[in-house]
Amino acid sequence: PICDFLDYLVMNVHNTSNNAGKKRNLIRGLCADIKDVSFSLDSKIFGENFEVLPLGIGKNAYRMQEDILFCKERGNANSTFNELVVMSPFLSESVIADFNLTDRALSDCKRTLVTRRSELGKLKASDVDNFTIYTLKDEIIDGEEEISDELADKKKQDIHAKIYLRRKYSDVDLYLGSMNASYSAINKNVEMMLWLGTKNMYLNGDKFLDDIFCGPAGDVKNPFEEVTVADAVLETESDNRNRLEQKIKELNNHESLEVIEKSVRLKLKEKICF
């Protein structure tokens, strides 16, 4: 599958790009080397149960929409689960609503969504009434600000990981990679995912959440907090205000650059005239 992905990249190096031929040869060389490589997890938790899943690369693409993770056919054994954890920075309402279907739940089913607060506005309460939802606390987001070297503007950071954990009885499926819980990512985009299989005794939703929460969900050390879709309203207003402030900063920086540029041109003109 990795070679299929690289072959797709070779075909999509445009002739107009710089050093197109060199880029193609480099990718082909990498593909040839990978064929001589064997992969092993060397893990007690996962054993050798793993698979690379390239999405959106044409005829050799893995059809993620047909994976058991997204099976919602009533009566199909693959559609049900005991635990589901979805961590995704970006969402589509339809994807989350399908995960939320009542008839997908087995006994004592737990569903958890970890996302960005700004995404909650895409959802209705009925889309997530079987989910417990978490977002990063404001103080964590504010504490992870990134400063742009060019404009010295602060840009807030939030979760980037895309992780899906599904448990049915003792079997656990873990998916890691680039695919958001969005319709486009699952059905259209070029993405790369890794599937890992394990057992409930080694990993499950509760153990995973205890890990990322740094203990129990209610502990003060937990960087996440429980929220509802109603919390999206205030966040949207805050986001709009932040975007406005960002645009004003960019405009001010742009105007400052123009003033400096005009000043330099004027000085050069004076020197030339002299």
How should each PLM-predicted stretch be described?
Residues 1-274:
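PLD/PLD-like phosphodiesterase catalytic module centered on the HKD motif
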